[in-house]
């Protein structure tokens, strides 16, 4: 079973049942991105290390017994038109390439 082929609901269910960890899901998506990114060029910025760290944090949170949101552990992508504190926000143009923000867009929080 390849997690990147599952629907969001299937991923969430498998993570909640501990059939998959968030790190398992992240590694599956990383494998897929690395396989096709050179041809597809879908990512303006991709930080594999941060992705894996956040997946580990999601797993730790889940295992701690703390309350979870309905999408907890599900990977998301943030289009580079939204300001983020820890990623460049290029607005899809070379003029803004590498630009960093000191605050985050509301949709990112």
What is the role of each PLM region?
Residues 38, 70-107:
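Enzymes and membrane/adaptor proteins characterized by extended Gly/Ser/Thr/Asp/Glu-rich
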Residues 48-72, 78, 97, 101:
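Flexible, acidic active-site loops/lids enriched in D/E/S/T/G that coordinate Mg2+ and/or position polar
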Residues 3, 40-43, 58, 87, ...:
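Short clusters of hydrophobic/aromatic residues that line enzyme substrate/ligand-binding pockets
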Residues 10-11, 106-108:
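Residues within well-ordered alpha-helices
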Residues 1-53:
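An N-terminal boundary/leader segment
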Residues 14-15, 33, 61, 82, ...:
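Hydrophobic alpha-helix position signal
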